[in-house]
């Protein structure tokens, strides 16, 4: 195998592995949240200490109260992976609490 072909195969393998990691791991974001008594206040009637989690089942999120910059608190939101369209398959939204609520494809003959 030539060195150019080896490089092409190596690049393809790296691309495929990184694509699988990106698809299987969903996404995370960190954002501002109201603070009350040093805790996260998502305005749902509850206060959450740093490290505590709560769930938004409607949007399929897991939210964690985290330590922000300079003593502030923030919310870290985890959500489901984004799926590419799979022709001939049906995207299923199972409901439930994150991560069980994450959509998935149901394909015939699979």
Swiss-Prot record:
Pfam families: SVWC (PF15430). Expressed by the venom gland. Contains 4 disulfide bonds. Residues 1-26 form the signal peptide. Its main location: secreted. GO terms for molecular function: toxin activity. InterPro entries: SVWC_dom. GO terms for cellular component: extracellular region. It is found in: Secreted. Keywords: Disulfide bond, Secreted, Signal, Toxin. Belongs to the scoloptoxin-16 family. This is U-scoloptoxin(16)-Er7a. It comes from Ethmostigmus rubripes.
């Amino acid at each position: 195998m030539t060195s150019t072909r080896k490089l092409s195969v190596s690049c393809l393998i790296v691309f495929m592995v990184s694509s699988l990691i990106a698809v299987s791991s969903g996404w995370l974001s960190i954002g501002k949240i109201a603070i009350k008594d040093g805790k996260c206040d998502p305005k749902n009637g509850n206060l959450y200490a740093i490290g505590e989690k709560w769930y938004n089942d409607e949007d399929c999120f897991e939210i964690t109260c985290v330590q922000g910059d300079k003593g502030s608190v923030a919310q870290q939101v985890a959500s489901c992976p984004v799926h590419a369209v799979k022709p001939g398959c049906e995207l299923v939204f199972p409901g439930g609490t994150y991560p069980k609520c994450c959509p998935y494809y149901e394909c015939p003959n699979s």
